[in-house]
Amino acid sequence: HQCAVVGDKFMRKVESGDKSARRLWGKLLQKRKATGEPYILFKGNTNKSNPAAYKKHGLKVHMTNICSEITLHTDESHSFVCCLSSLNLAKYDEWKGTNLIYDAIWFLDGVLEEFIQKSKGKVGFHNSVRSAEKGRALGLGVLGWHTYLQEKGLPFEGLLSQYETRKIFSQIKIESERASMALAETFGEPLWCVGTGLRNTHLRAIAPTVSNSKLSGNVSPGIEPWAANVFTEQSAKGTFIRKNPTLKKILRKHKLDNEIIWNRILKDGGSIQGIKALDKITLGPHDIPLKEVFKTFKEINQLELVNQAGIRQQYIDQSVSLNLAFPSIATPKWINKVHFEAWKKGIKTLYYTRTESVLRGDIAEQAMDDSCLSCDG
């Protein structure tokens, strides 16, 4: 895998019309559309929003990880450690107002301590242990975001989902920091956190969670929209048909959960937009049309996706595995606009650009990416 590290100075040159910069930027976007890579690390956005502990010690972020959600300091003496877990937003109503977030941070800090104790003195682990001891960075994230919205009858796009984004991720920020302060009082502040009142330099990062989302009730992965409402998936055990469980429940309620409907959705690449029988169905207290709520990844305005990600990034001290999806006919102008807006919104990293695998409603390729198993699960 490859990652392009892009600075603010370069982006301002692109913005001002510098021919050389625009030519290089165009090649980068063309490569992302053709192959899905390279990932992008917006270095300026990342380092401007570094936590107080990093700024105090002059620590900079120079790279990200294989899934683009980790933004931690590295140098000749320090290698970052991924210590991650994810909250299931499909079950948000069950755990909101509880100590789940608080307890999850204590759990992750304990996991990191076990890594430190077991890895001390082992060949090849010196830099990782040193980094973990000094910063104790964690990455609590989420999965099931699109499932949560669909269960509420809310579209991925618009003010309603933006409100939910602020509500949930601000809560995660507040509760995770409360836990880190309690940990610091109990066990002390590590070197890089001295004077901050926190036990951890970082607390939040959102991983892809493709595998973990399946194990958690077949919910949507990470903060990503469903690629399709029904799709074929290949694994070592064979080929399976997976259906959006929330849509299936609604179709059953309206006596439309039948093979004719599902075969039509599959034929249409996982989309329900062409099915007239679904035109008049509305959901939730806002009477949102079913077809708005169950738009697939490729049908969602990618600028809306970026706007939502920009809001979320304000509450995430590391980064987010953020994919973008474009049809093969997407113009260079549109792809540039979406990527440029990501930089302007303060987004730190961009993961894959999805094209044909999303359009087919077939996520077999997506599920089989050789991404990091720790991030994936």
Predicted regions and their residues:
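Short coil/turn segments at secondary-structure boundaries
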Residues: 2-6, 39-46, 119-129, 192-196, ...
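Glycine- and acidic
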Residues: 12, 85-96, 120-133, 150-166, ...
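Secondary-structure capping and boundary motifs in well-ordered enzyme cores
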Residues: 59, 73-81, 100, 104, ...
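Catalytic alpha/beta core of large soluble enzyme barrels
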Residues: 64-73, 114-118, 204-377
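Internal maturation/activation junctions in enzymes
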Residues: 103-129, 133, 152-209, 262, ...
